[in-house]
């Protein structure tokens, strides 16, 4: 389902990405997180910042594995009160189950993006992904360009199962071009490196690069190594981030 999907790379002062945790339950080498240690966004500070920002157009909860946070339903419920067009969760899907999906939908979650990077990984998560799509219809599959995902059979399997899929560029373009299924036709270009494709009647999207977005983009992360989150926090007088790793020092944080 492309209609209404938030392309989480496209972020303005009306859209917001919320990286609630750098905790992880995998070792995905394509992950942009420089520090893979337990760092959790403070709920009260999140609420304080949202009150200062006001209503966002759309919010994406991502970074590390958000489902590791025991308060994720509470977090989504809070965020949903400050968005007009919905909330998206990006997850590797390992911790998804029908109960948590139902609870998140009740809290206001409207979109789910499940990241998979190999045919074997997709088959392990296929059943819960289909369950998620049944409960939250706007569920898609994200395929990052990495060594395991270069074979087009992964994308073909996902599309045949009826998922809308986005092929995500590695943040530093380290892994080359994904081989798209034979017969894929490019049908659109948004002018910012996102391309629409169609294969055998199935639609999917491909991210090209990240080079055309400027410093006004807001991506909330508890660490600040990915963008200007700490600058943004300072601008709204909210600088208290929860850090549980003493090895992280200010020289490694974006200022």
Predicted regions and their residues:
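Catalytic cores of alpha/beta
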Residues: 100, 147-162
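Accessory C-terminal segments flanking Radical SAM cores
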Residues: 172-255
